[in-house]
Structure formats: structure tokens, C-alpha cells
Amino acid sequence: MYKKELQIGGRTLSIETGAVARQANGACVIRYGDTVVLATACYKDGVVLGDFMPLTVDYKEYTYAGGRIPGGFFKREGRPTEKEILTCRLIDRPLRPSFTKGYRQDTQIIGLVLSADGENDPDILAINAASTALVISEIPFPNPISAVRIGYIDGQIVINPTNAQRDLSDLDLVVAGTPDAIVMVEAGAREVDESVVLDAFEAAHNEIRRLCAMQLELRAEAGKPKLEVTYTPKFTADLVTELMGQHGATLKDAMQTKGKHERSHALKALKTQILGAVAPEDTERLAATHAAWAEMEVQIFRDLMLKEKKRVDGRSFTEIRPITIETNVLPRTHGSAIFTRGETQALVTVTLGTPQEAQKIEDFEGETFQRFMLHYNFPPFSVGEVKFMRGPARREIGHGNLARRALAPMLPPQEEFAYTIRIVSDILESNGSSSMASVCGGSLAMMQAGVPLRSAVAGVAMGLVTGEHAGDVAILSDIAGMEDHEGDMDFKVAGTRKGITALQMDIKVAGLPREIMARALAQAKDGRIHILDKMDAAISTHSAELSEYAPRLYTIQIPKDRIRDVIGSGGKTIRWIVEETGTKIDVADDGKVTIASNDVTSANRAIDIIKGLTASAEIGTNYKGTVKRIEPYGAFVEIMPGQDGLLHISEMAHGRVGQVTDVMQIGDEVEVQVVGIEPDSGKIRLSRKPLLPPPTEEEAAAAARAPRRDGPGGGSDRGGRGGFGGDRDRGPRRDSGGGRGGSGDRGPRRDHDRPRHSSGPRPHEGDRGPRFNSDSGAREASDAGMPPKTGGGDEGGNS
């Protein structure tokens, strides 16, 4: 086994090879803290036809790396997550251009996260491990690529910040490069200044050189001999010179044709003419002419830029294409905008949802929820092509993530705007910089939707064309498709007037001095301000009102110890509230309750119910309630939403009440006073007597003379019982020992000879209370002074 170590960011980074995955062409294990990543590199014999590099990159974060079992039914990892796809792109972008020219064999790189400590993100480790696996293998990958992450905390640059530090950082920058140059940049930021970004580039490159040196040391000890690759151009310089002499002027005119499709048709017609002049049987000459055509395009494109200072569409180097903006273009969406810049057009929509609709993300660190999503779609018609429309490709996921990172820092805190936000950007036309159009359209659509952004965000794609001499440099603002394809840099910059919020850069040339990078960033800022001026002219602040079709969110705070009262057993109570009111309800662990509804009345009803469930009735307090249910022994009165109590028939008036319905009906509003609350069950006893005028002497005497009910109880001083279900004027049971099954002093049964289940009259019931369906029901009624639950009903004091 071979091993190398390096101190970086205050921690030890080690790379080792030779112990595991020994049948791969190249394999290494990288460790940083307790995060461990295995990377392998393999190739297949046989040259693949075509002009592309047949490279496949796969990256997997096993949940066992964090000591977890995957969720879901199958309990194993499935298709790649968005984080894994983005990391694949992060590995692929710097490595793909770095293979020896002419190498065209199927190559696969696999990165596996074997252990994760939750502090060191494995993405940059995977880049370093993948490069090391290639460097020590037979695969012709001559120069190592290394990567670091840069943070910016309290005005200080931090190398490889931990995840906890990243939460505090104003900059989250990943930089990859060779010992000589930076080749790839990916960043999100909180409105940082361009000078901070330049300093971060410099600090990153210093660490990259050290990491590359470590890879070269490992190759010197454990590297395998490289495959021999012979690159033979399909064309000769003489052929290019010949064709340029014959068709150069025509090609130059065709390249400067206005309009993407018009230019494409002109170039295609000229190419067909040139190839048609070659005899069909001369296949070698045909292949050489085809290759020479591509070289001619490159030469004329660069000559226009560097010698004539012209762009193919006639713009100056700093000029932004014409911009048109429309907002509120779709009637039913919560927010919408069409942003058009030249021949690139994005239809961007915003949908507002409840906190429950946030995106659930599961990885080796556990479950998290993402409240802001941006989905980017690139249908084939946007470039006039015919293709199958399947799920989003890696490119679409990458572009959507870049646009999301650009907008996310400007969102209001969740405490101020609790909505889940989903943006969808559908590219309707594309001629370069569609991801930056998505940023602009997303900012406009959120403003129109009423999202209180801290500031508008715009983005612009910068390009670069370099010549043979150091001074031959053209920095291009708002590049179009051909400039992206033929140029030396694709540098996307998004931000506000104050600073940068997102960066993405891929460089095809070796070594860009700080001065050129500074000029590119300054020119990008000028372009960004120009675009923001256009956006502000269309909509300068967020709408005062949300769309009528957007849900309204209402937030209340309840005591944490009352959350269970809102949820109920198995979620029964909250489901009832949702069904009763037609709202959506989310209860957080801290007691924050969010109610979502399009109807204000329904939302207020849900709020009242929740407040009622979590409020506490107080003994001696008067309440105005509504009669919800009537039983022979009393009425159940709702004194607060979701809470009711028993108003016994004996507590309805000072005098004797024959039937409950003589006094009140269902739906009546009555004023009552809480006279008792059972400590165990929380059931509430109500009375009207304290609120009624005291009886006159005549009324009291009349009540005393009133005949008692006739019943089988005979001369009992409690009056007749009225039979099962009849009227009873019994009042609550005294605290004399509980219910039937308790140890109360009930006395012996008076009729010892009567059968237990006699169906005849029961003349000697005495002072025993009614029989219920079960002993437990009787005990509950006795303890609470209320009827027990019978037949599945709920006769308790609280609903």
C-alpha cells in the first residue's frame, strides 16, 4: 500500500492506493477527518468513433456512510439523488478536457462515499480521488486536477470549511485546477464583492498546487505506465489554407449572418457546397475536408474577435442583447414572467405552497426539507430539434441548481414568509445563457407573485477568446451559443447591485492572470446592472397582495405541552380539523402552527378551533356558548372552539326543570359559568344558576310544593327516576366512593331474592344511580359528573 498525507485547512488529508479495488485500472481511498471516499478509474479496449470523449462519471453516497438505513420500502439506495448528480457534474467538468488529445476509449470513473462525518463534504474529496485514480492508472491523463472549497467568514478566507462553518460563511466556493491554472469554479454567495472572489481564487490555487504535488508524488511511487496515444489530425494545414483561399470570404460572410437559424442555414449550405466538390469515392478527402471545415470556423471566429474586434452578431464586446420583459402572463399561476434576451427566452412561473409541501431530502446525514425549489426544463423545440422528452438530464439539473443558488440568498426568512416556493423555468428559445435567463425570470416572477425578495437578482454569461500573444484577449458580455462553443471560457455571474450571489466557470485555456479575471468580473457587473435596470423598469418591488389563487398562510403559537391536544390520538384531532375546515395545517415542534387556506372564513374557523383546543377553561369564569347536543340529563355546550362542557339539567334553573328542551334547543346561545373541571379527564361542568337572578320567596315556595316525578322509586326523596332514558333530576353523584365497581358505601342490595337480570319493575333502587352499558362507563360518569360514552358517542366534557 502507498500512502501520502497533507495538512490542509487544519486537518489531515490522506490518499492511499494498493489496498482495495486492485482490479481497477486505478483506485485510491481519500480520507479527511472521518469522511472516506473510494474512487476508481477503468477503461475499455477499442477506440470509439467520433469527436467526443466517451467518459462516464458515477458518484454514490451510501447511507451506511452516516450510520443510517435508507427510508422507503426497499431499504436500499435507488436512483441518483440530485446531490449525487450535481457531484457527478462537479467531477466531470474539470476532468473531461484534461485527457491526452486523441484518447477516445470508453472510460468510467466511480466515486463511493464509504464514511461521512457530517463535517467534511465528500464532493471535493471525490474530485481529488477521481483525479488520483486516473493519474496512477494506465489511462492517458497527464496532469492532476485538485479541488478545494473556500469559505468567507467574518472577513477571513477559510480553506475547506466544515459544514457548520459553511452555514456561517458568506461564500461557498469550489475551485478545481491544475498546478498552472484554475479550470472550474462553482459558487454560491451572499452578495460578496468581486474583490473577495478574486482573493478566494488565489487562495484556492495555492492549495490546489500542494494537492497536485501530492498526487504526482503518489504516481512516482505507485503509477502504472501510460497508454500510448498517437494523435493524427484528419486534415493538413495545406488543406485548410487551400479551402480558406477558396471559401474563406464566403465563410466569413455566412458566419456574420444575423439570426441564429439564418446563420446556421448559411453555414450549412456552404459546408454542403464544399463537401459536394469532393468525389464521393474519395472518403479520405471527405473526412479531411469535414475536419478542415471545423478548423476554418475556429480561425475565422477568432480573427473576427481578435483582429477586427467584431462579434458574429455585430455587437460590441460589452453589449447586452435586446431585452423584453412581460409579467403576470398566465392567469392561474401565482406568479409568472417571460424574460427574453436576444434569441433566448424563458417562461418562469412561481407556485406558493404550504410548509408541508417542502422537498424532502434524504441522505447519509438524515432527512432535511428544502423550502425553495427551482426546476429548469430545456425542451427540444427551444433549439428547433426533435428528441424524446424524458426526465430531466444532468445538464438541466445543474442549470436549475445554479439558478436556485443565485436566488436563494435573497429570499425572506421563513419566519417572515413561511411559504414553500417552487419556480419552474421552461426555456422556450435558446441561443446561449438560458440559465441566467432563468435567474432573471425567476426574480421577476417572484416579485410579481408577492414574494418579498430582499433585492432583485440578474445574471449574465461572460465569454473569453484568447490569441497566441498575451495581449490578444477579448472578454465578451452576454455570450450567444456560437461564442460559448468556440470561445475559451464560459463564466456565468449572477447577483444584485450590491454583490455576487452565484458563479459558475469552465475554462478551456491554461492560465488566466488575475488581471483578466478582474476585468471579466467588472464587465460582468456592468452587464448585470444594465439588466437590473431593465428589470426594475418592469417591476421594481414585490406585489402588495398575493395571487387570489395562492393559499393564505396564518401562523399562531401554542404552548409546546398542548401540541398533543391539537394532534390528538393517532392524528385524529388534526384530521378532524382539516376535514371540518378544508384547510392545511402544519404543527412544528416548537408549537408554531401554520394554517393554509384560500378561504379566510375557513382559516379563521381552524384558528378558533386550535385556540379553543389549547386554551384552558377557568373555574368561575363566564362563557357564552352554543348548545351542541341535548341528552335527557343535560346539554353539552361548546364554550370555546373544540371544547364543551356538561350543563346538567339540575344546573339550568333554580327551580325544577321537567325536560331540557323546555329550557333550550340545539343551536341556542347560552351564558354559563364553569363550576368544575375534572383533574384527570379535564371534563368541564357548567351551570347557569350563578348567572340567574336569585329566586323570589314565592318562586322558592312554589318549587318546594311542586309535585315530584312519579316513578318506580316510590317515596325516594330524590323523586322518580323516569325509567331508562327518562328524565332524571339526580344531579352529579356525590364524592362518596366512586362508581358501581368502586369501594363506595352503597349498601347491600335491598331485594336479595330478585334475579340479577329481572325484566320486571325495580321498586327498591333507592339512591343508586342509573345502570349503564358497562361498569367502566358508570365509574367514569360518577367520577366526572357526566354521562359515560355509549354506542360510540362522545359524552365527555371536551370534544
Question: What are the roles of these predicted feature ranges?
Answer:
Residues M1-K44, V48-L49, T230-G366, P551-D565, ...:
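Extended amphipathic alpha-helical scaffolds
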Residues M1-Y231, Q273:
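Long, basic N-terminal domains or extensions that often function
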Residues I8-R11, A21-A24, Y32-V36, V47-M53, ...:
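Short flexible coil/turn linkers enriched for glycine and charged/polar residues
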Residues A24-Q108, V113-N120, P179, E186, ...:
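Glycine-rich, flexible beta-strand/loop modules in the N-terminal catalytic cores of phosphate-handling
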Residues G26-C28, V36, N120-E138, T327-V350, ...:
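Conserved phosphate/anionic-ligand binding catalytic regions in large, soluble enzymes, centered on
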Residues G111-V113, V183-G188, V229-K234, G245-A254, ...:
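Short, hydrophobic beta-strand segments
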Residues E138-K258, M446-A544:
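Mobile "lid/hinge" segments at catalytic clefts and subdomain interfaces of large enzymes
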Residues Y549-P551, K560-S799:
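Single-stranded RNA-binding regions, centering on S1/OB-family and related RNA-binding modules
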